[in-house]
Amino acid sequence: MEILACLEKSFVQISDLIRKTNSVNLGNLVDTHNASGDDVKTIDVMSNDIMKDNLSKCALIRTIGSEEEDEFYSTKFTDAPYLICYDPLDGSSNIDVNITTGTIFSVYEYDANNKIADGHSIVMSGYCLYGGATQYVLAYNNKISFYQYSAEDGLFQLLNDNLKMKEKGAIYSLNESNKKAWTDARFNQLIETFIEQKYTTRWGGKFSCRRAQNADQGWVFCLSRQPQGHRRQDSLAI
């Protein structure tokens, strides 16, 4: 699929950028905030430029939406069937301390009235991780596939064409520093039950990393309701 080829090209370029550039420089703040209210770093801008440049050349993409831009971008392909939305570098706040980062994306199909009705319009979504390896997970055509980049041949290799989450794990993931804001006693009891059953807690603030850990190890992920909470990333990749 042409869209996937453009995404893969972007993933490799962002991975190379992270690996080959001074991470302190990449972590420098730019004097602006993005659409989610986050501070913007140099790596955010550069990653967004990579994604936008590659995807705007794809004849299947009509519109591009990025967390780093306030407005949607219309490509020259005005009759193309798809809108793509992405966070070009989830976890950029950790770039200068060498913690795994990622790209989150979702592709929507316009209906007969040239509208995106709701989440049911999603035809493909996933995320790419930039860490010890460059890997991406793709939800498409009623299955989830897992790929890893091979620098030796310059291609992404399929590792698992039917990725499934474990039915039960032994880890739960949430930010317990927000405990005083929890208002539902049932949620507090749920966490106490996890502790009694000797679950281990893990928490990383970035969705792409959390989602990868949850899928691989069968974690329970909890996102408590917060007025300042970043629900955008999680909603995007569902």
Annotate each predicted stretch with a short phrase.
Residues A80-K143:
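DPxDG-like acidic metal-binding loop motif
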Residues D16-N28:
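N-terminal glycine-rich anion-binding loops that anchor highly charged ligand groups
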Residues S47, I99-T100, F207:
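Catalytic-loop motifs flanking and including active-site residues across diverse enzymes
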